[in-house]
Curated annotation (Swiss-Prot):
Catalyzed reaction equations: N-acetyl-D-muramate 6-phosphate + H2O = N-acetyl-D-glucosamine 6-phosphate + (R)-lactate
Protein family membership: Belongs to the GCKR-like family. MurNAc-6-P etherase subfamily.
Organism, scientific name: Bacillus cereus (strain 03BB102)
NCBIfam families with a match to the protein in the record: N-acetylmuramic acid 6-phosphate etherase, PRK05441.1, PRK12570.1
Lineage: Bacteria, Bacillati, Bacillota, Bacilli, Bacillales
Name of the featured protein: N-acetylmuramic acid 6-phosphate etherase
Pathway: Amino-sugar metabolism; N-acetylmuramate degradation
Keyword Lyase on entry: yes
Keywords: Carbohydrate metabolism, Lyase
Domain SIS, chain residue ranges per copy: 54-217
Active site residues per record: E82, E113
UniProt function note: Specifically catalyzes the cleavage of the D-lactyl ether substituent of MurNAc 6-phosphate, producing GlcNAc 6-phosphate and D-lactate.
PANTHER family attached to this UniProt entry: GLUCOKINASE REGULATORY PROTEIN (PTHR10088:SF4)
A biological process term (GO) from this entry: amino sugar catabolic process
Length: 294
């Protein structure tokens, strides 16, 4: 029942929200937002377990699939679409599905989240299999679309995890691993795009970033698989080579072109003074880890 969910409770500190001036509203929001990271901190052990499973999927050439409705679905898609430019993944490695399809990203699709079968259809469309990990996201922890997706994922042997913002969430029953970040009452009653949405974004950031580190997408704290899809990222790529090798900007730019804009290869070439082909071979042997290739 909705009334039993902490995310649906009224916030005692903001009973007079409509009477506050603008500054008071903003201060109230900021005060509540400060509690979110602390709530996430309590779930780090559970988040770690999810990351380990995602890394295993990636190592087996499986995928990470997010499913959710409304804000939760949008956050999953947001995290997924940032992976190719940041970590050089293909667009299949991390995917996000939202109840109602992509059109629901910009406009609510009435009733879509209440249909379990829609998630099964979405997951069947990508040939979900036992190598994949499916993460169901729902602030309330009871969204039928997410439950349907988790049920189907379990039926094909995929790894499953859930992210919710209430304890003892319904979706937790359908996932092997659970992250339950209790964010409590929102300043605007039931508006889970606020603290709950912020918590979900923080958790998704953790899962995708830590998983990518785990499969060699990062060297030191540099995103060495960055894709140079625009002028800003071309410059960032050259700066990454400078930071990783200590070479001058001019040398970094030279090796960036020699390596056919492959930042990892350029770093190996500079540090080992080898040719492009040899750098690629070393990276292949090291399964993409720059440190091991060196």
């Amino acid at each position: 029942m909705l009334e039993n969910l902490s995310t649906e409770h009224r916030n005692e500190k903001t009973m007079n929200l409509d009477e506050m001036n603008i500054k008071e509203v903003l201060q109230s929001m900021n005060e509540e937002d400060r509690t979110v990271a602390l709530a996430v901190e309590k779930e780090i052990e559970h988040i770690e377990k999810v990351v380990r499973v995602v890394i295993q999927s990636f190592e087996e050439e499986g995928r990470l699939i997010y499913i959710g409705a409304g804000t939760s679905g949008r956050l999953g898609i947001l995290d997924a679409v940032e992976c190719p430019p940041t970590f050089g993944t293909d667009d299949k490695m991390v995917q996000g599905f939202i109840a109602g399809g992509l059109k629901a990203f910009t406009k609510a699709v009435e009733g879509a989240e209440d249909r379990e079968e829609l998630a099964e259809e979405d997951l069947k469309s990508i040939g979900l299999n036992e190598k994949d990990t499916v993460i169901g996201i729902a602030a309330s922890g009871r969204t039928p679309y997410v439950i349907g997706g988790l049920k189907y994922a379990n039926s094909v042997g995929a790894s499953t995890a859930s992210i919710s913002c209430n304890k003892n969430a319904e979706i937790s029953k359908y996932a092997k691993l659970n992250v339950e970040v209790e964010t409590g009452a929102e300043i605007l009653t039931g508006s889970t795009r606020l603290k709950a949405g912020t918590a979900q974004k923080l958790v998704l950031n953790m899962i995708s970033t830590a998983s990518m580190i785990g499969v060699g997408k990062v060297y030191k704290n540099l995103m060495v698989d960055v894709q140079s899809t625009n002028e800003k990222l071309v410059e960032r790529s050259k700066r990454i080579i400078v930071e990783a090798t200590g070479a001058s900007y001019e040398v970094a730019a030279e090796y960036y072109e020699k390596a056919e804009r492959n930042v990892k290869a350029a770093i190996v070439m500079v540090l080992l003074q080898c040719e492009y082909g040899e750098a690629l071979e070393k990276l292949k042997e090291a399964k993409g880890f720059v440190k091991k290739a060196l």
